[in-house]
Amino acid sequence: MLSRDMNIADFDPELSQAIAQETQRQEDHIELIASENYCSPRVLEAQGSQLTNKYAEGYPHKRYYGGCEYVDIAEDLAIERANQLFGSDYANVQPHSGSQANSAVFMALLDAGDTVLGMSLAHGGHLTHGAHVSFSGKTYNAVQYGIDEQTGKIDYDVVEALAVEHKPKMIIGGFSAYSGIVDWQRFREIADKVGAYLLVDMAHVAGLVAAGLYPNPLPHAHVVTTTTHKTLAGPRGGLILSACGDEAIYKKLNSSVFPGNQGGPLCHVIAAKAVAFKEALQPDFKAYQQQVLLNAKAMVSVMQERGYDIVSGGTDNHLFLLDLISKDITGKDADAALGRANITVNKNSVPNDPRSPFVTSGLRIGSPAITRRGFKEEQAKQVATWICDVIDNIEDEAVIERVKGEVLTLCGKFPVYA
């Protein structure tokens, strides 16, 4: 018999301490990694439930195991809410991650060696959009597009020219470090011109899409993938959506997720996804996403006033890239210095970066997490000021310590979990 009095602290104090330290780190640090966010206690409750004990290979009402009647309810709820949230008529909530979701789409619609056209990792794309170190670049013939050096925006004429030249079987729209608005309709027109599938990876902007603050790719893409964390603020996981109405594609996608890419689904995570989707359907979720945009723009305005270069000249979503080439400071060094000031960012390559991906010349900065803990424009501007102060005085530990103290004071006023 398992006693409910069992706890980690008594049994495994070393691990318990690590968990406690990470919990405190999240409270005491300003989180600006664009792909991170904070789950609600409701999501955490679902993810820590007894649903983790259940094996449920297959799909609701078509399982290979018995005893699935209640996890079927949870998965049905997640599917229904995902479709309601995004306007899709197909949803697969089983992918363990965004990369798994993308892998499943590739396997469903392509054969090994087929040509795909996606955004270059160096210009803001994702590993799974054709990077040579990923399955997407190893298994498939990957052709890459980038952004215009002058505007920092996607040049759709260049994308079209590449599509006409290489005749890809699938074109990928989406990004992991691009601050503009993507024209999904233009992507679909290009895909139709060459007879390609259009896959949109909206992992970074799914929350904004759900709130109606960023163009919804569902009316244009054959298939859409996303993560369920980031701007959606749910558990870590993946999601595949479609509104193309093609049942043959839906069947291929389901078979590609299970048994093609995964075995049993994570029932506790699916339940947590269902909770997160319900949260995203509430009116206050749109207000949150509106503030995410306002905070990102507020930070950009301060940094531009301080003489910093922003890739593409600004932001229209939750993130932006800080280009440090003119400062002759590496992203790695800036990341480390800010970390000592309790400000968490991630080093990131900028277009035509002369430095390696392990060093970089830029930082990627996002506003979802600080907004989640209650920051408004005033606090966002203060954070941007601190970032500039630290980078401008990157070897001055007195400045870094001063900023750290001020960060701790602000974090104390805006706890993540009150």
Curated annotation (Swiss-Prot):
Domain of life: Bacteria
Main subcellular location: cytoplasm
Presence of keyword Transferase: yes
UniProt-listed GO biological process terms: glycine biosynthetic process from serine; tetrahydrofolate interconversion
Keywords, in A-Z order: Amino-acid biosynthesis, Cytoplasm, One-carbon metabolism, Pyridoxal phosphate, Transferase
SUPFAM superfamilies: PLP-dependent transferases (SSF53383)
EC number, UniProt record: 2.1.2.1
Disulfide bond annotation, renumbered to this chain: none
Subcellular compartments: Cytoplasm
This protein's record includes keyword Cytoplasm: yes
Pathway assigned to this chain's UniProt record: One-carbon metabolism; tetrahydrofolate interconversion; Amino-acid biosynthesis; glycine biosynthesis; glycine from L-serine: step 1/1
One MF annotation (Gene Ontology) recorded for this entry: glycine hydroxymethyltransferase activity
Cellular component annotations (GO), alphabetically ordered: cytosol
Cofactor(s) the protein requires to work: pyridoxal 5'-phosphate
Binding-site residues for (6S)-5,6,7,8-tetrahydrofolate, renumbered to this chain: 121, 125-127, 356-358
Entry-linked Pfam families: SHMT
Catalytic activity line of the entry: (6R)-5,10-methylene-5,6,7,8-tetrahydrofolate + glycine + H2O = (6S)-5,6,7,8-tetrahydrofolate + L-serine
N6-(pyridoxal phosphate)lysine carried by residues: 230
Family from the record: Belongs to the SHMT family.
Listed NCBIfam families: PRK00011.1
Function: Catalyzes the reversible interconversion of serine and glycine with tetrahydrofolate (THF) serving as the one-carbon carrier. This reaction serves as the major source of one-carbon groups required for the biosynthesis of purines, thymidylate, methionine, and other important biomolecules. Also exhibits THF-independent aldolase activity toward beta-hydroxyamino acids, producing glycine and aldehydes, via a retro-aldol mechanism.
Subunit structure: Homodimer.
Protein name: Serine hydroxymethyltransferase
Organism classification: Bacteria, Pseudomonadati, Pseudomonadota, Gammaproteobacteria, Alteromonadales
Gene, per the UniProt record: glyA
